[in-house]
């Protein structure tokens, strides 16, 4: 009898194991084959075109290889930068048209290029969340730009005061000091004949790093620079991670890349804790500002502690850390990219450089630029908008569809991703005219609304409720830096300049920006 019981027990256990294995196998099969084929069928019925689904990898292998090859050679100044920044997307749209899709592993990603549909997606940001990410990406930055729903609303509300108009005015002296420090170095480096070839890219990176360190975190460049270097290294690894299929649980495996990313994160957190502790002590002694970003974050953390973790009271220390990582990187990369492309394009178009300088000298002469008159620089603003059109900091935005959704005359099934290809839209001749690929700031002479015909076709900082919180900060810093540079130098492209726009989360010059600077 006992033997029979044991036999039945073994059979039951075997059946249970078999059920689990079959269930797991079905989930895998559904993920890598059944679901992708259903989604592809649904998209094709509605007129979307793209490559046929390839098991597991989709288009990722081809896309990664095209990106790798694109980075090996520069392009001409007149070439479309999308060719180098997003070569596979460029090829897909050229081959299949605007209503196209690509495969990110087993997930189809649809290109949306209709302004009205883009507007609806941007306005209903609560409905179209960002794609689920590999947990390792959170090591790089897990702040406001990545949050959704109530968490995003809480963080946005807490951080808004740091970017109010009066607060930006208070930041101007620190910005000015950093700019003067940079141009003073240039002045000393330039020879007696008044000219010198210089790669301005690392100087502009240091400038924006210094500004964000002082204005947002009350720390020195030396303290912040360690964080910047670590975050830059992490960004390269994040780009590689995003080019591979995410497999649940893979982030826990001790692969070389996983170990490296976690090691960088440990170092970053250690550096940030030193800055946080220093700031906390200064605030407790009544010496540190409480209305910069870090001050606001730490006051919020105090509320969290006093509220004993009650919902929406404040931020946990991990949330504070996530915001610090994000603002350190975004606050530096966005403005340095805008400035370097502005200097490159003004080197190519000396007539616009001269017009910008004339306006700056009319407003300020050789005196220190002030807040109110910086906002009256019409030509400089037109130039910055045109640079943001041609070289937006982020070239593409991504969203996901969690439930079947109708947008205009299309119905997107749950499970697909949405791509809003900013750079492609910014270069679209159907939107901007025959000169869409040319540098022409005059198109913004009557403002953004007139230039875009009130369509959502220009969104270098996003659009709608989730527009970049630091947009005005970045533009103020760029106007000030450009004004100070134009007061002191003229510049042109060096013969050694190599035009190689690439994306490392933001669009930047792969081989720097060699210019010839002339003292005025």
Swiss-Prot record:
Belongs to the cytochrome P450 family. It catalyses: oleanolate + reduced [NADPH--hemoprotein reductase] + O2 = hederagenin + oxidized [NADPH--hemoprotein reductase] + H2O + H(+). The chain crosses the membrane at residues 14-34. The keyword Membrane applies. It is a single-pass membrane protein. This is Cytochrome P450 72A397. GO terms for molecular function: heme binding; iron ion binding; oxidoreductase activity, acting on paired donors, with incorporation or reduction of molecular oxygen, reduced flavin or flavoprotein as one donor, and incorporation of one atom of oxygen. Its cofactor is heme. Gene3D superfamilies: Cytochrome P450. The keyword Methyltransferase does not apply. GO terms for cellular component: membrane. Heme binds at residue 468. Keywords: Heme, Iron, Membrane, Metal-binding, Monooxygenase, Oxidoreductase, Transmembrane, Transmembrane helix. It comes from the Eukaryota. One of its GO terms (biological process) is saponin metabolic process. InterPro entries: Cyt_P450, Cyt_P450_CS, Cyt_P450_E_grp-I, Cyt_P450_sf, Cytochrome_P450_Monooxygen. It is found in: Membrane. Its EC number is 1.14.14.-.
């Amino acid at each position: 009898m006992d033997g029979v019981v044991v036999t039945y027990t073994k059979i039951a256990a075997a059946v249970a194991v078999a059920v689990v294995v079959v269930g797991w196998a079905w989930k895998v099969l559904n993920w890598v084959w059944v679901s992708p084929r259903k989604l592809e069928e649904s998209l094709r019925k509605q007129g979307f075109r793209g490559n046929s689904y390839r098991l597991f990898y989709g288009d990722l292998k081809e896309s990664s290889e095209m990106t790798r090859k694109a980075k090996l050679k520069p392009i001409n100044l007149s070439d479309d930068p999308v060719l180098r920044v997003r070569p596979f997307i460029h090829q897909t749209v050229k081959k299949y048209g605007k209503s196209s899709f690509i495969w990110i592993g087993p997930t189809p990603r649809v290109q949306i290029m209709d302004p009205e549909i883009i507007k609806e997606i941007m306005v209903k940001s609560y409905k179209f969340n960002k794609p689920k990410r590999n947990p390792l990406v959170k090591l790089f930055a897990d702040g406001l730009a990545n949050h959704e729903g109530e968490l995003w609303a809480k963080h946005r509300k807490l951080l808004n005061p740091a970017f109010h108009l009066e607060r930006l005015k208070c930041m101007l002296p620190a910005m000015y000091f950093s700019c003067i420090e940079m141009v003073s170095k240039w002045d000393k480096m330039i020879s007696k004949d008044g000219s010198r070839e210089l790669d301005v890219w690392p100087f502009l990176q240091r400038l924006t790093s210094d500004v964000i360190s002082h204005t947002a975190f009350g720390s020195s460049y030396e303290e912040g620079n360690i964080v910047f270097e670590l975050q830059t290294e992490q960004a390269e690894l994040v780009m590689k991670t995003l080019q591979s299929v995410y497999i649940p649980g893979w982030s826990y495996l001790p692969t070389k890349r996983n170990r490296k990313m976690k090691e960088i994160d440990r170092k970053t957190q250690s550096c940030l804790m030193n800055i946080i502790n220093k700031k906390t002590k200064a605030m407790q002694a009544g010496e540190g500002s409480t209305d910069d970003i870090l001050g606001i974050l730490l006051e919020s953390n105090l509320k969290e502690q006093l509220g004993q973790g009650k919902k929406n009271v404040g931020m946990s220390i991990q949330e504070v850390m996530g915001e610090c990582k994000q603002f350190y990187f975004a606050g530096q990369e966005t403005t340095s990219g805008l400035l370097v492309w502005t200097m490159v394009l003004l080197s190519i178009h000396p007539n616009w450089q001269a017009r910008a300088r004339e306006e700056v000298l009319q407003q300020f002469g050789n005196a220190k630029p002030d807040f109110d008159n910086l906002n009256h620089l019409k030509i400089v603003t037109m130039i910055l908008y045109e640079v943001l059109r041609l070289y937006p900091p982020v070239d593409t935005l991504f969203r996901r569809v969690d439930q079947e959704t109708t947008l205009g005359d299309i119905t997107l099934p749950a499970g697909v991703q949405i791509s809003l290809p900013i750079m492609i839209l910014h270069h679209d001749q159907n939107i901007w005219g025959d000169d869409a690929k040319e540098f022409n700031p005059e198109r913004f002479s009557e403002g953004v609304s007139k230039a875009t015909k009130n369509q959502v076709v220009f969104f270098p900082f996003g659009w709608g409720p989730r527009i970049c919180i630091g947009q005005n900060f970045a533009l103020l810093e760029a106007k000030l830096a450009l004004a100070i540079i134009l007061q002191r130098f003229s510049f042109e492209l060096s013969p050694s300049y190599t035009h190689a726009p690439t994306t490392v989360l933001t669009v930047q010059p792969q081989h720097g920006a060699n210019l010839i600077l002339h003292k005025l």
